[in-house]
């Protein structure tokens, strides 16, 4: 099967974008993995699919936004991808609106195209209840910090174990954020997989490593669930800033420096949505022959 694709990136987080507004391609998990493969496919952190609203979608929804990780699994949300989604539907003349309502597994989001070409996404309010992350707190005691708390997680075997302190929340997908002294030397490669697959996270988790530079500036690395460390993670940036605000470390508007670029995150507090602003760029377009894979 030969398909048309668009390669895009937002702050270095890269995507293959597929247009299914005129009909579904019916790709399997193995075929999504093929497209994401950097040696045999196109190469991407995630595969993003544009579809019409689903049956029973809320009134006023313009599109459905479907996300598959590089491992082929479907996930709830991707912030950097949402910005690329907005640029895609504008550049491909699927809408002429500056703001669209988009249906995801995590709920409705509203990307907005700015006059400067950057895209702002209303990511909705963060979720703090452990059961909704989901995060199993049985036998754990919260560690009060600022106006919130963190949790101690044991990682690794007895011979090579560590205790890390993480703030746990959901931005439509689960995040565990820890504050580190130096993000460049943080043990992302070692601890990231252990946190991602920690048994207390039933759906696995994105592991964030945040260095607070000052109250309006952080540096961030994220080991993404199903993708590994990426150059940037939009929901990870949102989760880190929200955690930092609740822990008393950050102001309401923060620039997040990732390896791929800068994202600006704003949050006014409990019950308010998180707003994420950043770049979205088309890299190239093409066609690829996708083999029949189960």
From Swiss-Prot:
Active site residues of this protein: 78, 233
GO cellular component, one term: cytosol
Pathway in which this enzyme or protein is active: Amino-acid biosynthesis; L-lysine biosynthesis via DAP pathway; DL-2,6-diaminopimelate from LL-2,6-diaminopimelate: step 1/1
SUPFAM superfamilies referenced in this protein's UniProt entry, alphabetically: Diaminopimelate epimerase-like
UniProt KW Cytoplasm keyword: yes
Site (Could be important to modulate the pK values of the two catalytic cysteine residues): 175, 224
Enzymatic reactions: (2S,6S)-2,6-diaminopimelate = meso-2,6-diaminopimelate
GO aspect biological process, one term: lysine biosynthetic process via diaminopimelate
Predominant place of localization: cytoplasm
GO molecular function terms noted in the UniProt entry: diaminopimelate epimerase activity
InterPro entries documented for this protein: DAP_epimerase_AS, DAP_epimerase_DapF
NCBIfam families the record matches: DapF
Function: Catalyzes the stereoinversion of LL-2,6-diaminopimelate (L,L-DAP) to meso-diaminopimelate (meso-DAP), a precursor of L-lysine and an essential component of the bacterial peptidoglycan.
Assembly: Homodimer.
This protein's name: Diaminopimelate epimerase
Source organism of the structure: Variovorax paradoxus (strain S110)
Lineage: Bacteria, Pseudomonadati, Pseudomonadota, Betaproteobacteria, Burkholderiales
